[in-house]
């Protein structure tokens, strides 16, 4: 079992990363999450802000840390990765669209949440899917 840790920028990512289904997936892959830290906003993913979070996850036994963020208003994935800064034993995952766009595309989940007939034809075209939800 490989111990990993996560640093994310918001509650949506936190909800997914701490879900039982995600933990079961990690287990199937031979991975164990030692913790998820929500820095509450991508501006808090700057190196001086995440240093202590990385240290805490490593102290808990993580051998690799995954940082999850959205592209947001950045024009380029590379610029987003450079803003966060690459580090040893760290993987930066940049979602091109905000993760909330995935919810807009999941008709079954949205039907359960809103208890009705839900359909959203082009979630990938939403500039700010969180506000749409």
Regions from the PLM with identified roles:
Residues 50-69, 112-130:
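A broadly tuned preference for mixed-charge, low-complexity surface segments
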Residues 15-18, 76-80:
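A short acidic (Asp/Glu
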Residues 1-60:
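RecA-like P-loop NTPase motor core
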Residues 2, 61-64, 88-90:
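Short coil/turn segments at beta-strand junctions that form active-site/ligand-binding loops
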Residues 43-47, 72-73, 83:
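A short linear-motif detector with a strong N-terminal bias
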Residues 5-9, 62-74:
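Acidic beta-strand-to-loop metal/phosphate-binding motif
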Residues 77-133:
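Activity-critical C-terminal alpha-helical subdomain
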């Amino acid at each position: 079992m490989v111990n990993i840790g996560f640093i994310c920028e918001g509650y949506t990512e936190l909800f997914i990363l701490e879900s039982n289904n995600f933990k079961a997936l990690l287990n199937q892959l031979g991975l164990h999450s030692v913790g998820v830290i929500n820095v509450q906003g991508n501006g808090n993913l700057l190196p001086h802000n995440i240093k202590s979070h990385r240290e805490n996850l490593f102290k808990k036994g993580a051998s690799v840390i995954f940082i999850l963020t959205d592209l947001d208003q950045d024009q380029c994935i590379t610029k987003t990765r450079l803003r966060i800064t690459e580090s040893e034993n760290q993987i930066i995952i940049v979602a091109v669209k905000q993760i909330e766009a995935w919810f807009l595309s999941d008709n079954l989940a949205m039907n359960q949440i809103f208890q009705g007939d839900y359909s959203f034809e082009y979630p990938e075209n939403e500039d700010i899917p969180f506000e749409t939800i």
